[in-house]
Swiss-Prot record:
SUPFAM superfamilies in alphabetical order: P-loop containing nucleoside triphosphate hydrolases
Enzyme Commission code: 2.7.4.8
InterPro entries: GK/Ca_channel_bsu, Guanylate_kin-like_dom, Guanylate_kinase, Guanylate_kinase_CS, P-loop_NTPase
GO molecular function: ATP binding; guanylate kinase activity
Annotated protein name in UniProt: Guanylate kinase
Biological function: Essential for recycling GMP and indirectly, cGMP.
A Pfam family hit: Guanylate_kin
Swiss-Prot/TrEMBL keywords: ATP-binding, Cytoplasm, Kinase, Nucleotide-binding, Transferase
Length: 196
């Protein structure tokens, strides 16, 4: 393959809220060999205390989000816990064109849409699972960003999402962040670098 024809791969990472997606991704994102970068999602939810606009998410109003949908500026979008989340197309394709391997940390609903749109050879999909629902609930509580009602909604949603894990190429158990990150790193070295 000629150098000019090379393009990056999309790495879809999903899992229930609180499973540790960001924690695991943060441990592998700086592996130089893998040439990884984040796709920054757009959301209507309010930022958490440590989050920055344009870094963690593009935080927008409901009106701005709906405008992006109408203009066809999102690869996918989904509604979760009364908030909308979506993947802006323009930046995603720019990064892939620069031969970057782009991590899409997205909800199951959004991942399904992306997999329906993309060519099969352009992505791999990975689903993170918790050791148990009890542990997932504990993680959501200690995160201390959700009300009891929101946690209840997220657990209910997690039970539905966990039933869809076999629709992904790989499943990683996150019982220990370091071990889960090592498994993710191994998968990426094997499946992303082999395509280069």
């Amino acid at each position: 393959m000629e150098e000019k024809n090379k393009k990056g791969k999309i790495i879809i990472i999903s899992g229930p809220s609180g499973v540790g997606k960001k924690t695991i991704i943060d441990q592998v994102i700086n592996n130089v060999d893998l040439n990884l970068t984040y796709s920054i999602s757009m959301t209507t939810r309010l930022p958490r205390e440590h989050e920055k606009n344009g870094v963690d998410y593009f935080f927008v109003s409901e009106e701005e989000f709906n405008s992006a949908i109408e203009k066809g500026e999102l690869l996918e979008w989904a509604e979760f816990a009364n908030n909308k989340y979506g993947t802006p197309i323009k930046n995603l394709y720019k990064l892939i064109g620069e031969n970057k391997n782009v991590i899409l940390e997205i909800e199951v609903q959004g991942a399904t849409k992306v997999k329906d749109i993309l060519n099969r050879e352009d992505y791999i999909s990975i689903f993170l699972i918790p050791p148990s629902i009890r542990e997932l609930k504990r993680r959501l509580k200690i995160r201390d960003t959700e009300t009891k009602e929101k946690i209840k909604q997220r657990i209910k949603r997690a039970k539905v999402e966990l039933k869809l894990q076999n629709e992904y190429d790989f499943i990683i158990l996150n019982d220990d962040a370091k071990n889960a990150a090592d498994k993710l790193r191994h998968i990426l070295y094997e499946k992303v670098l082999e395509k280069k």
